[in-house]
Every structure is written in C-alpha cells, then in structure tokens.
Design a protein with these regions (language model features):
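Transition-metal
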Residues: 1-82, 142-172, 197
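Ligand-binding loop in jelly-roll beta-barrel domains
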Residues: 27, 35-40, 56-58, 68-71, ...
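Short, structured beta-strand/loop micro-motifs enriched in basic residues and often containing a Trp
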Residues: 89-97, 222-226
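An exposed, glycine/acidic-rich loop-and-rim segment of catalytic or binding clefts
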Residues: 93, 99, 110-112, 117-172
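Short acidic-glycine-tyrosine-enriched beta hairpin
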Residues: 99-112, 228-248
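Functionally critical, mid-to-C-terminal surface segments that flank or help form catalytic/ligand
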Residues: 155-213
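Short beta-strand segments in beta-sandwich/barrel cores
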Residues: 206-208, 223-228, 241
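Structured binding elements
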Residues: 218
Length: 257
C-alpha cells in the first residue's frame, strides 16, 4: 500500500509510524543525510530553538566521519574568549581561522555540533549527518567564495554573534570515537535531547526490535545484507537508509555491515 508514496505523504497518513505522540500536522523531527566534503564548508553556526529568529528553527546536528583524506580537519569552537565585536572583526578581515580550533578528523569519530558552536569541515571527508529537521544556518566566514554572479556570498554576522557559544572549546577532545562492540552487536554511540545514535555491527545475524515509542532509521555505511521481517527480506548495501515505523516489533539484520 506504500509503493510510490512520498515519505511526507506517508507520515501524514500514518503519523503513528513516527511515534504515538506524533500528529499528521507535525514536522518530521530529524534529517539523515550524507555530506561529501571536498571544498571547505563555510564556518557557520546554528541557533537553538530558544534563540532562533522569527520564523526560524533551532538546529543541533551530529557528524559521523565515514571516511577522511589525510589532512581533513574540522573547525570546532573558539580557542579562547573573545567579544562579539572581535569575532565580527575577524570574520570581516578573513582571520577567523586564527581564533577557531582546528583538529584532524578520522573515520569512526562523532562530532556533536550543538547549537551555538562555530564549525566547519575541509580537506575531503564523507560524513553521515543526523540533525534536527531545520535549515537555519548563520554563515560567519565563507573563505571569500563568490556566487554565480561573482558576488561574495552573504554572511549573517549580526545574527551569528547573538547565538554563538563563546565558551572556549578543546578541539579534538570533543570527538567521540566509535568502537566495534562485538561481531553482532548494537551499542550506544551518541545521545542528545533531539536524537540518539547507535552503532550496529553485523558479521552474521542479529535480532533487533523497534518499539512503540519511536521510529528507527537504519543507515548502512558499509557491506551488504538483508533486513528480515515477517517472512520477507529487504536487501541493503552501503549507502542505503531504511525507515522502520514505531511499533514494528522484532526484526533481524543478516549479512556483513
């Protein structure tokens, strides 16, 4: 009955697939996507739900580093305390990189870009991103890139200056390193008030369960295999993402991933 149905139509018709509390008028709470980073992402910040501007929404996100070239690095938070005016001066002078932490990234790391944290990524990396379903981004420095008309892309310095977390960060110490928990294992990876991330390792087969309180998304980063449910097999390979409705119950994953 769902074949050919767009995802937004599906959750509108079957809101209980998201959670018992979800309404057909609600916005799906998260986005799951890949970022293929070659050129630097602009140094940016996202507001929280509390300090987002009129008509805007907060945005928290987590990056899982799938692969990274030698030299790939993240920009993450301020090195030392500075004022709003100093921050804007650095952004306009093109010297913001001098006051932002930089750290190498490695496959298996999780970086939590909480609302207010200055962040960017460069040097060649594939990232699996989980985020609040929001596109609110305040661009602070864009490495002097130009748009199709040859103009420097717009910055959002006034908005950014009001929401930035000015607490100095410690760079690489903020990374969570993912580790394999076993041959067939599901282990906790990262949790915040907006979403939870777990690591699934499968060498043969594992039994899992999707309970009534929430949906699950299975994002496969490597390997191939099948999801087994109610006597059916649903094939997957690296890059596939499956939505499992709340209350689905017991299912299995077989293969290698």
């Amino acid at each position: 009955p769902y074949e050919g149905m767009a995802f937004d139509e599906y959750i509108s018709k079957f809101p209980q697939a998201v959670s018992p509390q979800f309404s057909s008028l609600d916005k799906f709470p998260i986005l799951v996507k890949f970022l293929d980073v070659e050129k630097p992402i602009s140094i940016q910040v996202h507001p929280s739900d509390e300090n987002a501007g009129p008509g805007e929404e907060g945005k928290a996100e987590a990056w899982y580093i799938v692969s990274a070239n030698p030299g790939a690095r993240i920009y993450y938070g301020l090195k030392e305390p500075i004022t709003k005016e100093q921050l804007k001066q650095h952004a306009l002078a093109g010297t913001l990189e001098q006051v932002v932490n930089q750290a190498p990234v490695q496959p298996g790391q999780v970086w939590y870009n909480h609302p207010g944290i200055l962040h960017s990524l460069e040097g060649g990396a594939l990232v699996a991103e989980v985020q609040q379903n929001s596109d609110t981004t305040y661009r602070v420095y864009d490495f002097n890139r130009k748009d199709a008309q040859g103009n420097l892309r717009e910055l959002h310095l006034e908005k950014a200056a009001e929401v930035i977390d000015y607490t100095p960060q410690q760079g690489a110490e903020k990374a969570i390193q993912s580790k394999k928990a076993g041959a067939n294992a599901l282990s906790a990876l990262f949790s915040c008030e907006y979403f939870k991330m777990k690591r699934l390792d499968v060498e043969t087969r594992i039994e899992l369960c999707c309970k009534e309180e929430s949906f699950q998304c299975l994002l496969f980063l490597e390997g191939k295999g099948n999801i087994l449910f109610a006597g059916e097999r649903f094939a997957f390979q690296a890059g596939d993402c499956y939505f499992l409705p709340a209350g689905l119950g017991a299912y299995e994953v077989e293969g290698a991933c």
